[in-house]
Amino acid sequence: DIEALLATPFEGATVKEALVEKTATIGEKRSIRRFEKVSGDVAVSYIHGGGRIGVIVAANGASDDAAREALTNIAMQVAAMNPTYISRNDISAEELAKLQEITVDAALNDPASLPKPILNKLIDKAMNSSAWSDEDKAIYEEKKSNMNYLFNFLSKEAAAALAELAMADKDAIVSDKIFKGLADGRVSKQLKEICLLDQTYVKAEDGKQTVAKYLESVNKALTIAKVVRFEVGEGMEKKNEDFAAEVAAQING
């Protein structure tokens, strides 16, 4: 409720009065478009780039200086890496199923990345049908001794035809143990990118420590309750800038 927030006492006035005063001071209108309320044993904030990105991290289990420092580091991580979820447990079954479906379809539409046994079956179908032109069939016969470079020589139409064959045979391919391992690996990689606790901690000395392991090294009782990330113009048309690289440079510099 933004109206309730505007009426909230703030530094001897109300939030609304403070905004009016700020507008008068800088000559530019200031308004609140959205806000988040957080709660926990401790909460820290981090502002990047003169206010272009703001992050709040709330946690439970500890509130000492070490916990605050750790959460500030995590807030910088959130500013740079912009995770979608705190942990995998926050992803609904529907969202996970959608991610898996997208990953499977992406793999099938990129035949060059498919496991060799599956790719070879698709090529056999293309060679024994009209899916490929005579020219592409000849190219395959010439280059099949080195499959790693085959797609450098096949036409775009030939690659697209293999993708169509793969999608048509989707049920059988998805049930293949080798393909399942490939798809599961790609999903796991994506989860590590979008889940904060699974991300590699940006200040990890070994380049491998996850955020979860970093928090555990600070205090095993420290758990993240909520993360809020705001970016100027978020949800509105804006110039695309590489905030992530800028924050990462600040962290490492």
Listing of model-derived features with the role each one plays in the protein:
Residues 1-253:
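N-terminal assembly/interaction segments in proteins that build large macromolecular machines
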